[in-house]
């Protein structure tokens, strides 16, 4: 019944973000209180502030690590490359969402756009940290899918001419867990 969170509530939400939590939710009494919209806005502000204070340390995450899966290796390569290039976005064309999940486990300020043809995958991806899921039309042709992805990013104002982004996909297309390609693109 209070429009302003307590210091403890702010601390709990901020620490959850700093601990790498994918999602935060309201308790029943907060969600049903007198100020539900204000509470959500405040939580967004707290989460955003906590995320921007974090320092990206991908070198520490990857140093001495061996990845057993090809899709995981490609996901980590996309994160590392995008971070060091100052890429505007990372795009994962994904059936199951596993590539985006691998990426979301590491702190990076570059937004991750997970493009999927499956509504169930899009819904699951909505809970992953720093992942913005987009539903797209199905395409069996890799080049067509890559062009569609860039068109989606441009249409939404995510990238513009001259921006660099990283994109991952599998060849052949449509195989869950089959991500085996990383491409660095410059928007023309």
Question: Which residues fall in each region the model found?
Answer:
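C-terminal binding/interaction regions
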Residues: 160-168, 172-173, 179-185
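Conserved, mostly hydrophobic/aromatic
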Residues: 16, 103, 165
């Amino acid at each position: 019944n209070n429009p302003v969170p307590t210091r403890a509530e702010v601390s709990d939400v901020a620490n959850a973000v700093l601990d790498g939590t994918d999602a935060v939710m309201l308790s029943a009494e907060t969600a049903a209180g007198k100020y539900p919209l204000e509470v959500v806005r405040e939580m967004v502000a707290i989460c955003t502030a906590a995320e921007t204070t974090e320092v990206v340390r991908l070198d520490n995450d990857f140093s001495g690590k061996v990845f057993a899966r090809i899709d995981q290796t490609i996901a980590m390569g996309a994160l590392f490359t995008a971070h060091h290039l100052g890429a505007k976005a990372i795009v994962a064309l994904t059936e199951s969402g596993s590539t985006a999940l691998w990426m979301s486990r590491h702190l990076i300020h570059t937004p991750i756009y997970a493009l999927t043809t499956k509504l169930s995958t899009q819904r699951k991806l909505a809970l992953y940290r720093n992942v913005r899921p987009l539903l797209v039309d199905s395409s069996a042709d890799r080049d067509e899918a890559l062009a569609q992805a860039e068109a989606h990013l441009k249409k939404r104002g995510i990238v513009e001419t001259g921006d660099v982004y990283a994109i991952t996909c599998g060849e052949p297309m449509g195989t869950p867990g089959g991500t085996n390609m990383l491409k660095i693109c410059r928007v023309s």
